[in-house]
Curated annotation (Swiss-Prot):
Keyword Protein biosynthesis attributed: yes
Name of this protein: Eukaryotic translation initiation factor 3 subunit F-2
This protein's record includes keyword Cytoplasm: yes
Taxonomic lineage of the native organism: Eukaryota, Metazoa, Ecdysozoa, Arthropoda, Hexapoda
GO molecular function, one term: translation initiation factor activity
One BP term from GO: formation of cytoplasmic translation initiation complex
Self-association and partners: Component of the eukaryotic translation initiation factor 3 (eIF-3) complex. The eIF-3 complex interacts with pix.
Length: 285
């Protein structure tokens, strides 16, 4: 593929990537002004999907505004990620800040080798949340200069669209619901996961009631049938395997136990990380 394809192809960004960058910025080492790392995703024929990322440790030199990346760490984490997600490839790098840094061209040279034929993308995220908004901009480097003379790089803006699947939308609705609570409750933990399951089940029940009313109205000739809706319903019904109530109950209970185990383990890990952070702060003091 041509390197210029990155300038023409549509680029879709998954919300998970933004959450990972914000979390890394919030947990950045003391004294660091920004975080940066590698963007991962998939190259399609007509578009690019940024689906994952990981941070790369770096060292900032204030005297010459230069940034050194830990290349060994980046290579090792990338190799591990390829085992877990073999379909993901390096698409470029991300950085937090308000503008493209002076060292962007040097970092660009490293990711040119990692991206192969495709031009690496540069995602700039302003994590300062100015005006309570998260600013995201995507750049692609273009060579410029006089033929036969010194050439440089110009980072041009590339259209970026945040793409969400059904699972992403469900998670973001839960986060939005919690963020709209009173200020006195903002620091409390999320509602128990089972409560969220009940809310989701109630929402599904309301949608099913609406669907049944529509079907009954069509059968009673109160509404005109729609072929598109009919084909969509048929596709949805055929996609769900036919199970009796006992098998469904067994499958649901098994998945519920797995979810509770995952919640317990994640809570233990979270508690361990919080204790580790507090101990690190005590040592710094």
């Amino acid at each position: 593929m041509s390197r210029n394809l990155s300038m023409r192809a549509k680029v879709f960004l998954k919300p998970l990537v933004l959450f990972q960058i914000i979390d890394a910025y919030d947990r950045r080492p003391k004294g660091d002004n920004q975080v940066m790392g590698t963007l991962l995703g998939r190259n399609k024929e007509d578009h690019i999907e940024i689906t994952n990322c990981f941070t790369v440790p770096h060292k900032e030199h204030s005297e010459n505004k230069r940034i050194d990346l830990d290349m060994t760490y980046a290579s090792e984490v990338l190799e591990l990620n390829m085992f877990a997600y073999p379909n993901e490839r390096v698409l470029g790098w991300f950085c937090t800040g308000k503008s493209v840094s002076r060292s962007a061209s040097l970092i660009h040279d490293y990711y040119v080798r990692e991206c192969g034929e495709r031009q690496p993308l540069h995602l700039l995220v302003d994590a300062s949340l100015k005006n309570q908004r998260l600013s995201t901009r995507l750049y692609c480097a273009v060579e410029m200069g006089v033929p036969g003379g010194t050439k440089g790089l110009m980072f041009s803006l590339v259209p970026l669209e945040i793409s969400s699947e059904n699972s992403d939308l469900l998670a973001m609705r839960c986060i939005e619901k919690q963020s709209q609570q009173q200020a006195s409750k903002q620091m409390e933990r999320f509602a128990p996961e089972l409560v969220q399951v009940v809310d989701a089940t109630r929402d599904i029940q309301q949608r099913l009631d609406l669907l049944l009313r529509y079907i009954n109205d069509v059968l009673a000739r109160k509404k005109k049938p729609d072929n598109v809706v009919g084909r969509s319903l048929q596709a949805a019904l055929t996609a769900v395997p036919l199970l009796d109530s006992e098998k469904f109950r067994l499958m649901f209970n098994t998945n519920l136990r797995d979810m509770l185990m995952a919640i317990t383990l994640s809570t233990m890990i979270k508690t361990q990380l919080e204790i580790s952070e507090k101990l690190s702060c005590m040592q710094d003091q």
